[in-house]
Amino acid sequence: LSDSIKLLVPPGTSSIVDNIKSKTERWIRLNKENLDLSKIKSEKQMRVINFLLENIEAPALEVLDFTDVTRDVFVALQKKGVIDFFDLEVQRNPFFGKYVEKSEKLKLSDEQKNVLENIDIKRYDKYLIHGVTGSGKTEVYLQLIEEVLNTGKNALVLVPEISLTPQITDRFIARFGDVIAILHSRLSIGERYDEWRKIRDGKARIVIGARSAIFAPLDNIGALIIDEEHDSSYKSEMNPKYETKEVAEYLCKMYNCPLVFGSAT
């Protein structure tokens, strides 16, 4: 039972919860009530004040970069009571610093259109999309998910761990932006924890992950996609043993939504 429960709680909370700390960022806030411009003689201090008069508060590193001052200027302003420092929690972002150009949906072939039109997103049923790598299955997934999102529902996409490459995730990010959460073993425990919370808090509308992502706290599922459904990794041989497809069927019946399998064999 304890092994099963571990699948349903945030990564890291089972035994090392004290080791996972929230990530914070140092911010600066302007204290207008203590501001007396007649006492500010430093041009560098005025640069910081002018920036904060427009923004009130901002990340300290951003202020440093924009105003081109040193931390000594902050210290001087803090001593005068003009600014305060505070820490603001920020989520770890597995894609931080990575630019993915936004993409528009592609024109579907007649065969792809036929496949998409035959998937009823309003009720439970199982569908199999067959096609070798590069045949266009992913574009069908993307346009199916777009239809689901337009109804106000969410989508879950499972991919074998070995196939969960940056190329795959980049295609989804390019189409849907930051409403995506990723869950796989190559993320740090802190990144997985924050992605889990992003899903739980309703900030993610699409979850992409390996086998265990089937237990992500995603609500209001409108479509569940299992890519490369023939892959043996979807069956867990370790405790707790489970068959991902069986769990997926249960979820789709519960949410009355389609279960879509993709296969190249």
Task: Cite the ranges covered by each PLM segment.
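Accessory, non-ATPase domains that flank or precede helicase/AAA+ motor cores in DNA-metabolism machines
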Residues: L1-S263
